[in-house]
């Protein structure tokens, strides 16, 4: 079974942990609603009561087996929430096969500059091998009122051929589409690499920022 290793990165409070939990269907169920995240704990509410589920993104790993286009694969998702910036910068990881950069509509105005910087650093540690660095952008919290935060950056991202999606971890918007897009992007890259006669095992590195 093919395993796809996914690193989710982004600034503070963009919803990395909530999205990770939703993608692997660990804690958040359809009948519950995420209220807040404080001190590495998620608080959920249903119609009857309140309760607390503990979650530590620095130790929890998240795996999900899925069938995509009649092929079964394993998604292994790394949530970088809680990592200090200095530690992340120096992290030498032979781990990731795809990067997910997460933003929300309240930091969208700085999104393009940040994604460009992140992509540049990935390419540097990947020795400039652009075709080996699948990168997908997710704009989270699509359920919130964001009209006042709008900008023209989405069009620029599309022009630069960056794949991006809108999502909501709370409302489960596009949560099933995202892993399908990730895997299909990876398979597409591998197929192109093989057709060029370049397919070979290479050491993987990633830089988390």
Curated annotation (Swiss-Prot):
Class in the EC hierarchy, top level: hydrolase
Name assigned to this protein: Ras-like protein
MF-aspect GO terms: G protein activity; GTP binding
Binding-site positions, GTP: 10-17, 79-83, 140-143
Lineage: Eukaryota, Metazoa, Porifera, Demospongiae, Heteroscleromorpha
Provenance organism: Geodia cydonium (Sponge)
Gene3D superfamilies attached to this UniProt entry: P-loop containing nucleotide triphosphate hydrolases
Enzyme Commission number: 3.6.5.2
GO cellular component, one term: plasma membrane
Annotated localization: Cell membrane
């Amino acid at each position: 079974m093919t395993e796809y290793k996914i690193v989710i990165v982004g600034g503070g409070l963009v919803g990395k942990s909530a999205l990770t939990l939703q993608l692997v269907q660990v804690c958040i169920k359809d009948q519950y609603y995420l209220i807040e995240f404080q001190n590495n704990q998620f608080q959920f509410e249903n119609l009857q009561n309140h309760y607390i589920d503990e979650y530590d993104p620095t130790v929890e790993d998240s795996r999900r087996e899925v069938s995509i286009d009649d092929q079964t694969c394993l998604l292994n998702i790394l949530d970088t929430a809680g990592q200090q910036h200095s530690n992340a910068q120096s992290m030498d990881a032979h781990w990731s096969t795809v990067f997910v950069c997460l933003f929300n509509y309240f930091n969208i105005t700085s999104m393009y500059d940040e994604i460009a910087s992140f992509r540049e650093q990935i390419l540097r540690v990947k020795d400039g091998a652009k075709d080996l660095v699948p990168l997908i952008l997710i704009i989270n919290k699509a359920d919130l009122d964001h009209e006042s935060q709008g900008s023209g950056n989405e069009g620029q991202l599309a022009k630069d051929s960056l794949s991006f999606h809108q999502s909501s971890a709370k409302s489960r918007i596009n949560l099933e589409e995202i892993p399908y897009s990730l895997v299909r992007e990876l398979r597409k890259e591998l197929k192109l690499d093989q057709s060029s006669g370049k397919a070979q095992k290479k050491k993987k590195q990633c830089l988390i920022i």
